[in-house]
Structures are given as structure tokens and as C-alpha cells.
Amino acid sequence: HPGAGNHKNTLVNALIYKYKNSLSNMNGDSRPGIVHRIDKDTSGLLVIAKNNLSHSNLGKQFSDHSIKRKYLCLAWGIIRPLNGRIETLISRNKKNRQLMTVSDINGKKAITNYKTIKVFQIKDIPKISLVECKLETGRTHQIRVHLKYKGTSLLGDKQYGKKNIKFKKINKDFFNKLSALDGQALHAQTLAFIHPTKNKLVSFKSKLPMDFKKTLDLLNNLSG
């Protein structure tokens, strides 16, 4: 939705153009139909409510943490352990209010369950992991903050990315190809919830965007 420095070319602009007044207005005129959010430059699924009754029902499911969300991401290095559960408090970064951080005292509880699907080991290139993340909560920047907490970051993440990743000269071409990622390598792949009017479980799955798929294909080809 429109935010600081980004008032055009948003999902809300497209929704208003296509559906005009056929959207819920529980969040006011600036966010019609928007029940939840995903980070800017993250691809994948969002659920949109066309009326206030559905919006209220879906909002409660998000509040109860009963909606199932699964993300795929590419991260630098290897997360230890390979599979696990991250449970912390997350609050706004005091030094940079646009970022979030893990907090020992203040903040909202955030839980991410993760599973390493594959580790790519390519000569002269830092290891890269394909990771599946399932959210029990949906805090702002949650996956990215939790990965930083574990000592890593997403490929293409300009806000939380690691600054000390070293590439040898021979792999400048590889680095340039990674730079073609359209944002961080994070994709909201599946979303499942109880339909607000049909009262049955519905599940949706989104294909990987082309830039993510090309990067994954590149890693698979180089790692053998």
C-alpha cells in the first residue's frame, strides 16, 4: 500500500482501479481491502477482502495466528541448526525507525519455523541456502529480522543484508547476476485459511517470480 516515498504503483492503486468501491473499508480509504501485508519487494500471496464482514473474519484469523503461511527464501551461509524454531520479541530499531530488531525486553512475540531445503556449495562463492519458513506470527520484517538474528540475511536484501560478503574476482559475473534480483529473495508461496463465508479451508499457492526462479536455476546449475 502507499507509504513513505512510495505513493504510486502499489497494490492499493491497482485494487482501486479494478474494483473501485467493491472493497472493504475497515482500514479507511487509504487501505481498501487490505487485511495484512508483506514486505516491500517481497513477492507472493496476499488476501484481499471485498466486504467488511469478510475482512473482520479474516482479520480475526490473522489475530488468532490460525492462518497458515509459508515462504521460500534464499539466504547467505548455513543456518544452524538446519531446521528449527525461532521465538523472540521484535521491536522497532531505535537507531533507524524504518527497521525492526530482536529485543530482549520490549516488543511483540514473533515465531518463525524454518527448514533448510538445500545448501548450495559453489567454488569461490559463499554458501547459499534455500530455506522454507512457516510463520506463526506476522510481525513487520519478521523473517528478515530472524535471519539476521541467526547471523545471516536474504540475497538481495538492501536493508538487512550482510555487508561483509566477499566474492573473488573470478565470480564478479555471478555477483552481477544476483544483482538482477528484483528485491530480496523472499516469496510468500502458500496461504491457507477458513473461507469467511463458505466456512471451509481454502489453500492457495503462488509460483516463484521469474527473477527468483532464474537465480535458483543458476545456483542449481553451478552446484551440480
Region roles according to the model:
Residues 97-105:
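Short aromatic-glycine motifs in intrinsically disordered, low-complexity regions
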Residues 1-85, 89-94, 211-220:
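RNA pseudouridine synthases
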Residues 15, 47, 73, 114, ...:
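Residue-level signal for inorganic ion chemistry
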Residues 40-41, 67, 108, 139, ...:
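Short flexible coil/turn linkers enriched for glycine and charged/polar residues
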